[in-house]
A protein has these predicted regions:
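Terminal low-complexity tails and localization/encapsulation signals of metabolic enzymes
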Residues: 70-83
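C-terminal long alpha-helix characteristic of the crotonase
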Residues: 2-50, 80-83
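Helix-centric, low-specificity signal for extended rod-like, repetitive segments
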Residues: 27, 68-69
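Interdomain hinge/lid region at the active-site interface
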Residues: 64-65, 71
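Short alpha-helical scaffolding segments that buttress acidic/His motifs in well-ordered protein cores
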Residues: 33-36, 56, 72
Length: 83
């Protein structure tokens, strides 16, 4: 699955910028998104939606989720710790 195309010129800078953006996200959320994507070809839509809901319910119990809410309310960048 590809979601970006970069020109040869500036490729490394663009790829690095994209990687840093992904790395700044909450680890549990990114891990669950990757797992969902990898398993989606083997599941029905209903099974995918159920698993996504379960993942969202789990993520909502983490310290990183609260950090995201707090950071949004305080208009600052979140600092995720994988907790």
């Amino acid at each position: 699955l590809a979601n970006r195309v970069f020109a040869d010129e500036g490729f490394l800078d663009a790829a690095r910028e994209f990687a840093l953006k992904v790395a700044s996200k909450a680890p549990f959320s990114m891990q669950l998104a990757k797992e969902q994507l990898n398993l989606s070809a083997e599941r029905t839509l209903d099974a995918c939606l159920t698993a996504e809901l379960e993942g969202m319910m789990f993520v909502g119990t983490t310290k990183d989720w609260q950090e995201g809410v707090d950071a949004f309310a305080e208009k600052r960048a979140p600092i995720f710790k994988g907790e």
